């Protein structure tokens, strides 16, 4: 079989997308496709027509044709089989068999066509392999990116928490009439300057310019007491580094205390048997209340680095009362899991894979029950003259959770300037480039389960939706845990470590 070209065309012969597998000019392929409708005989049910030089093998698809142009000595049976594969590929990338949809996904189709045919000859591939090849999906890359993003979020959350502690310490010192920490040892002539510098002035970091904002000016004087300790300098350098990478940090005017600790979270101490428990939530709520849809997916990934612990069983504790659906891996003994809540292989003599992440249990929860929402967000915009007063509240309904690095993103009207902030729990950032107000909360837990933000800006109520939320938690929502690991032979306990992550896939208030 020698395939010259594959094309999707209209019934009038107009080419929408065409891929030539041999050298052929544009004029030549357009001429062949333009002549194709005139050669068809509507009185016969053949799916091919021939000319003196080429053969057309075609299949109608609603108002379009899938056409293969081959040499006359090609195998017609192989041509028809290849045509069926081409026809099955198109619906994989196009939702409708229409000209606009085909044009929009033309490059995806061309890439898929190249996987089917190479240099005019059919490749031995099926539909699933074509999808895999074109997506170029890499599980290792996804895992690496997820781990890196988690570490970055934890570092930022820890930095914000330390900054908040320093601000609170300065406020307490001012309230008691003492000097702010980090400014001791001033002479009498420098007391007033030190007090002024110690005042907490919240600033809005705008991202209109890509240049890094200069560091706040520091008090100068001959006294040696103005020098900070080494730890304070490390924290300053870390914050400056984050700014240079484009991260907008809420800062206070004045020096940081020497009590600042190391910001980066310590690495997880992985045992030879390590479990990763990950959950992702996708949630959509209405602005007037009510849960439109909530879907949560979770998985336990097992990683074994020592071959002597490859034949083990995991003891799972499921305290979920919401009706979550559980599903074990096909190689896991389902009867053992149902009867004793243990995860083990069907064949006890076999071992789990070594040095690779293996998904052994996954679960799914889908609901429209409003009481299942972990974090409720209420946004109340009200027009007041030429401006709009917006009040946003959050409340943690699932008090067993501790949400870290919470960011509530409120869209703003463009071209109206920065919002005027009233009362706020936590911190905020105004991203003028993306027209967003980001409400940042380092931690939301049972002790800090509710808060509010008030601001004013010109606009209409619809301008402030959809509100989006992101967070991360080290405690999973469905409360499914591995409590014990034992060996198959002898039932002796095995040391193991666990890493739990609860992430947001989509969290919107429309």
Curated annotation (Swiss-Prot):
<dbReference type="GO" id="GO:0030126">
    <property type="term" value="C:COPI vesicle coat"/>
</dbReference>
<comment type="similarity">
    <text>Belongs to the adaptor complexes medium subunit family. Delta-COP subfamily.</text>
</comment>
<feature type="domain" description="MHD">
    <location>
        <begin position="270"/>
        <end position="510"/>
    </location>
</feature>
<dbReference type="Pfam" id="PF00928">
    <property type="entry name" value="Adap_comp_sub"/>
</dbReference>
<protein>
    <recommendedName>
        <fullName>Coatomer subunit delta</fullName>
    </recommendedName>
</protein>
<dbReference type="InterPro" id="IPR011012">
    <property type="entry name" value="Longin-like_dom_sf"/>
</dbReference>
<keyword id="KW-0963">Cytoplasm</keyword>
<comment type="subunit">
    <text>Oligomeric complex that consists of at least the alpha, beta, beta', gamma, delta, epsilon and zeta subunits.</text>
</comment>
<keyword id="KW-0472">Membrane</keyword>
<dbReference type="GO" id="GO:0051645">
    <property type="term" value="P:Golgi localization"/>
</dbReference>
<comment type="function">
    <text>The coatomer is a cytosolic protein complex that binds to dilysine motifs and reversibly associates with Golgi non-clathrin-coated vesicles, which further mediate biosynthetic protein transport from the ER, via the Golgi up to the trans Golgi network. Coatomer complex is required for budding from Golgi membranes, and is essential for the retrograde Golgi-to-ER transport of dilysine-tagged proteins.</text>
</comment>
<keyword id="KW-0968">Cytoplasmic vesicle</keyword>
<keyword id="KW-0653">Protein transport</keyword>
<keyword id="KW-0931">ER-Golgi transport</keyword>
<keyword id="KW-0813">Transport</keyword>
<dbReference type="InterPro" id="IPR022775">
    <property type="entry name" value="AP_mu_sigma_su"/>
</dbReference>
<dbReference type="GO" id="GO:0000139">
    <property type="term" value="C:Golgi membrane"/>
</dbReference>
<dbReference type="GO" id="GO:0006888">
    <property type="term" value="P:endoplasmic reticulum to Golgi vesicle-mediated transport"/>
</dbReference>
<dbReference type="Pfam" id="PF01217">
    <property type="entry name" value="Clat_adaptor_s"/>
</dbReference>
<dbReference type="InterPro" id="IPR036168">
    <property type="entry name" value="AP2_Mu_C_sf"/>
</dbReference>
<keyword id="KW-0333">Golgi apparatus</keyword>
<dbReference type="GO" id="GO:0006890">
    <property type="term" value="P:retrograde vesicle-mediated transport, Golgi to endoplasmic reticulum"/>
</dbReference>
<dbReference type="InterPro" id="IPR027059">
    <property type="entry name" value="Coatomer_dsu"/>
</dbReference>
<dbReference type="GO" id="GO:0015031">
    <property type="term" value="P:protein transport"/>
</dbReference>
<dbReference type="InterPro" id="IPR028565">
    <property type="entry name" value="MHD"/>
</dbReference>
């Amino acid at each position: 079989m020698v395939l010259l070209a594959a094309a999707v065309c209209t019934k009038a012969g107009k080419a929408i997308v065409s891929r030539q597998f041999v050298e052929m000019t544009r004029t030549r392929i357009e001429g062949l496709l333009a002549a194709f409708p005139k050669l068809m005989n509507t009185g016969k049910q053949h799916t091919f027509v021939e000319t003196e030089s080429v053969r057309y093998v075609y299949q109608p698809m609603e108002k379009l044709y899938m056409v293969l142009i081959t040499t006359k000595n090609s195998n017609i049976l192989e041509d028809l089989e290849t045509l069926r594969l081409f026809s099955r590929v198109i619906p994989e990338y196009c939702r409708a068999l229409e000209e606009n949809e085909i044009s929009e996904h033309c490059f995806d189709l061309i890439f898929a066509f190249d996987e089917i045919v190479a240099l005019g000859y059919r490749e031995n591939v099926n539909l699933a392999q074509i999808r895999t090849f074109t997506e170029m999906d890499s599980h290792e890359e996804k895992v690496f990116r997820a781990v890196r993003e988690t570490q970055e979020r934890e570092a930022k959350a820890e930095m914000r928490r330390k900054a908040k502690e320093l601000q609170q310490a300065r406020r307490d010192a001012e309230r008691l009439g003492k000097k702010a920490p980090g400014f001791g040892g001033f002479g009498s002539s420098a007391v007033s300057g030190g007090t002024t510098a110690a005042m907490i002035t919240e600033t809005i970091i705008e991202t209109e310019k890509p240049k890094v904002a200069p560091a706040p000016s520091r008090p100068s004087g001959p006294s040696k007491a103005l020098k900070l300790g080494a730890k304070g300098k490390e924290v300053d350098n870390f914050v400056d580094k984050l700014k240079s990478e484009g991260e907008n940090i809420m800062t206070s005017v004045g020096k940081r205390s020497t009590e600042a600790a190391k910001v980066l979270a310590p690495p997880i101490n992985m045992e030879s048997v390590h479990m990763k428990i990950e959950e992702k939530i996708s949630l959509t709520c209405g602005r007037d209340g009510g849960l439109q849809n909530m879907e949560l997916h979770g998985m336990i990934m097992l990683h074994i680095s020592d071959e002597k612990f490859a034949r083990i069983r995991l003891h799972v504790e499921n305290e979920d009362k919401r009706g979550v659906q559980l599903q074990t891996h096909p190689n896991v003994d389902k009867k053992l899991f149902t009867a004793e809540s243990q995860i083990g292989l069907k064949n006890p003599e076999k071992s789990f894979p070594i040095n690779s992440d293996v998904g052994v249990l996954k679960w799914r929860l889908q609901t429209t029950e409003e009481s299942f929402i972990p974090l409720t967000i209420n946004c109340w915009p009200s027009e007041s003259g030429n401006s709009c007063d917006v009040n946003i509240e959050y409340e943690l309904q699932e008090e067993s959770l501790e949400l870290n690095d919470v960011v509530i993103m409120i869209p703003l009207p463009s071209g109206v300037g920065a919002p005027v902030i009233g009362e706020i729990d936590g911190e905020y950032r105004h991203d003028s480039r993306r027209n967003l107000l980001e409400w940042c909360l380092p931690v939301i837990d049972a002790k800090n389960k509710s808060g509010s933000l008030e601001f004013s800006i010109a606009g209409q109520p619809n301008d402030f939706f959809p509100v989006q939320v992101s967070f991360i938690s080290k405690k999973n929502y469905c409360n499914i845990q591995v409590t014990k690991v034992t060996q198959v032979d002898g039932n002796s306990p095995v040391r193991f470590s666990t890493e739990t992550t609860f992430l947001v896939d989509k969290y919107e208030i429309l």
